[in-house]
Each structure stands twice: as structure tokens, then as C-alpha cells.
Amino acid sequence: MQKYNMKGDVKMKRQMPIAKPLLGREEEEAIREVLQSGMLVQGKQVKTFEEAFADYVGVNHAVAVTNGTIALDLALKALKLDTGDEVIVPAFSFIATSNCVLFQGAKPVFADIDQKTFNINPSDVNEKVTAKTKALIPVHLFGQPARMGELKEIAQDHELYVIEDAAQSHGAEYNGQKTGTLGDIGCFSFYATKNMTTGEGGMITTNNSKLARTIRLLRHHGQTEKYHHTIIGYNYRMTELSAAIGLVQLKKLDERNEKRRKNAAKLDEGIEKIHGLTPPYVEEYAKHVFYQYVIRVEDDYPLERTKLADHLKETGIGTAVHYPMPIYKQPAYRKRGYDKTMCPVTEDSCRRVLSLPVHPAVNEKDIQYIMANLQVHSSS
């Protein structure tokens, strides 16, 4: 196998963050134009961003909001869930996915994941459906679409809504169709570490005009005309500054996603040859956008996951654990009686996963440096 020798530029210690927002002169100019206009909210930038994003993913409606959590919250509010209703969510995700179910007075029901992709397992979803189930929230984790064909079949059989948590999958595709267009509603985040960012921000996508109208009302105080409010709503509007940044970032998204895929392919090439490390698995149907590049540290790798992360940190390589425990084991959920939930694949994954830098600022020498530091402990 190829050996990544620590010599020349590769030998020099590097500082490589796990994520790096890429903002430049175009974003600065877009912000300057907004500031000079004097219109910081409810101007043309948000509307233009919504139209551009809807066109990019391929839906009739896109609604810009303050962040990805709010996107999920408003999507669920639009469904008008009742107390005691159940929503099936993955046990392996960022906690906002299930928290937003609790915000409605509904109950998140945790389903296990597929070992290879870390996405929600349709077979376990099917087992968890009850008479109280009203919706599913598949998460397109780390940038790979979930098995939406099977999940939509389950939803159709049981007359359930499907809300896509697309917070990590900007531009990802399932059989050529972009995430955020596959269910009843799609929810995106533009947090600073995402494939495209507005600092904070979110977007809700749908082809359902009735749901879109309800979401727009909820976003803006339930207001249909100035000082006329038909429902109880909120102030969840995106600012003009955020939208201006988003418009610039959206234009760069495909190119940057392609750089992520190229970096991932180079990482795959090295990691596949290191005994005890398993690279990400990509489904045949998927156009993965690698929000995170997540490996599994197996039992036969010389270092346990935490020790490997510590070693990489010492060498300047940023890593992260997405995620260290199932949501149902978080203290806030234990108090709600979820401590008896069992999702064995999730629990095993939580002790093995490790995210490595894959963002567009990572270059060829960075990848060689990562490989050399992974290989140094391997007998391969």
C-alpha cells in the first residue's frame, strides 16, 4: 500500500479546523449594498433569496427563517399536531430534530439507523409506527440522502407527513432529485459550518401552497396585512443581511460541494487501506455533499476513538464526534422517561464515529498529512 511519509511540506505541523466558513469579497460587497440601502429587514433580498433557493432545489415555495431549528419548528406547527401525537425521528442526529417535536407537545419516537450510512433505518421506522404516529422526520445525515423511497412508502401506507431535515444536505440528491423536495416539507439550516452559510439562517421548502401560506403567516406574527393578524404567530424572519450573504453563497454551492466530493474521494483512497478504519459508505442513489466526512474507528484499529482524536488534535488536525450519544440518552431526555429506549446500531456508532476535515479549504497536502497521522498507528 502507499505510505504517506512525513517529509517536506507534509512533515510540517498544520492547523486544520474541522470546519471553515468561506466568505470573501462578494459577500462583503453584498453586505455593503444592504447597509447602504438602509433596508435591513423585509426588503428585496429575502424575497430574491427565497426565489433563488426554490429554483435551485426545484420547489414552488421557499420560506426564509432565522435558523434551521425554527424551520423544523414552523414545519411541525403547520401540521397542527395535538398533544400525544407521535413523530418518528432518528436516534442519531443533532438534538434539534427531536426537540422541535417536543415544542409541539407531541412525542418523538426514536428509530435506529443503518450501520453503513448512519441514516434512519426504514425497517425500524416501520416497526415504530402506531395509531398515534402523524409524521416522520428523516435526517439526510452528513450530506447523504436517507432512503426516501422506502420512507415515503411507509408514510403513504399510514397517511403520515414527511418532513425532511435537510440541515446538512444542501445540494444533495436522491436519484437526481434534490433533498428538500422529496417529502411534504424540507427544512434547511445555514449555520456557519454548513456547506453554505448566512451565519445563522434557515429555509423551509414545499410544493404545498396551503402549508406554505400557513408557514409564512406563522413566521410574521400571523399578519395578513399591516396590523391585521389572523392567527397567533411569531417573529422568525430572516434579515436582509443574511439573505444577501445567502444569495452569494448559493451561487458557489455546487462548486464547493464538488470540492468536498473530491476531497472525500482522496480521503477514501487512503482510509480504505488502513486496517481498522472504515470510510463513509455512499448509496448508489445518492449524490453526497459531505457536510461531514465521518469514519468508523473499529475495534482492530490500534487506538480507541478518543485516543485517536487526541492524537490528531496534537498534530493540528481538527476532529469532531457527530454524535457522542443517542438523543434519548441526553440528560434532558432521560428525565422524560426515554432511558429505556434501545437503538443498538446508534449506540455502537456513537462510540466509533469520528469526523475528519473535508471542507473546500482542505488541499492535497492536508490530506496527505491526515493520512500520515492515521497511518502512523496502523500496522497496514
Predicted regions and their residues:
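N-terminal "arm"/small-domain region of PLP-dependent enzymes with the aminotransferase-like
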Residues: Q2-M39, K44, T315, P357
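PLP-dependent aminotransferase class I/II
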Residues: K7-K11, K47-E51, V59-A62, S123, ...
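PLP-dependent aminotransferase-like
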Residues: K77-A166, E173
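Structural detector of well-ordered beta-strand residues that form the stable sheet scaffold
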Residues: V63, I88, V109, V162-I163, ...
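Short beta-strand-to-turn element immediately C-terminal to the catalytic PLP-Schiff-base lysine
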Residues: S189, G202-N207, L247
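Phosphate-binding glycine-rich loop
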Residues: M39-E86, C100-Q104, F110-D112, Q177
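Conserved active-site segment immediately N-terminal to the catalytic lysine
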Residues: E164-T197, E225-T230
